Amino acid sequence: MSLIRPALVLFILLTLLTGGVYPLLTTSLGQWWFNSQANGSLIRLNGEVRGSGLIGQNYTAAGYFQGRPSATAETADNPMASGGSNLAASNPALDKAVSERVQALRAANPDADPRVPVELVTTSASGLDNNLTPAAALWQVPRVAKARQLSVEQVSQLVNQATQTPLLSFLGQPVVNILQLNMALDALKDK
């Protein structure tokens, strides 16, 4: 009987601490220090949400840069179905899917180098990746430039401007956010 009271008090204290104080503290600090990230890294244009800087979107038009293929079920880039394809490198289904993607990309990008960047034909671990390497974005430049009736130099310059490099080079590689790049293309068209 003498152990029940301290156990009950400890249970109530820990419940309040871990179920109330800690979540409120972390949420408050997140909103204060990392407001944009804590709210989904939303990208707005004229006050309207265009998407998240973290979640890929399915672009199919020739005048837009396309991101990595999505492994999400049924609907491409569906965040509710996030997950990789879980196909091993030795799986024939992966080989077939990659071959089909390579053929489709070569057909859609006849002026590009026949060596398709690997990230354009393989899914990311989350299936929702919105970033590409600059090389993969530059590979698509001839198609986008032709569809938008822009020079290759203009579109290449946009890719270079949209390239984000990590603060310290050993923390990652340079990336291009496809949503922001496509928004920059639309802004160029509106000028």
UniProtKB/Swiss-Prot annotation:
UniProt family annotation: Belongs to the KdpC family.
Entry membrane topology: Single-pass membrane protein
Keyword set, alphabetical order: ATP-binding, Cell inner membrane, Cell membrane, Ion transport, Membrane, Nucleotide-binding, Potassium, Potassium transport, Transmembrane, Transmembrane helix, Transport
Pfam families, sorted: KdpC
Protein source organism: Klebsiella pneumoniae (strain 342)
InterPro entries for the chain: KdpC (IPR003820)
PANTHER family: POTASSIUM-TRANSPORTING ATPASE C CHAIN (PTHR30042), POTASSIUM-TRANSPORTING ATPASE KDPC SUBUNIT (PTHR30042:SF2)
A molecular function GO annotation: P-type potassium transmembrane transporter activity
Lineage: superkingdom: Bacteria
GO CC entries: plasma membrane
Compartments, as annotated in UniProt: Cell inner membrane
This protein's record includes keyword Secreted: no
UniProt-recorded name of the protein: Potassium-transporting ATPase KdpC subunit
Oligomeric and partner information: The system is composed of three essential subunits: KdpA, KdpB and KdpC.
Transmembrane residue ranges: 6-26
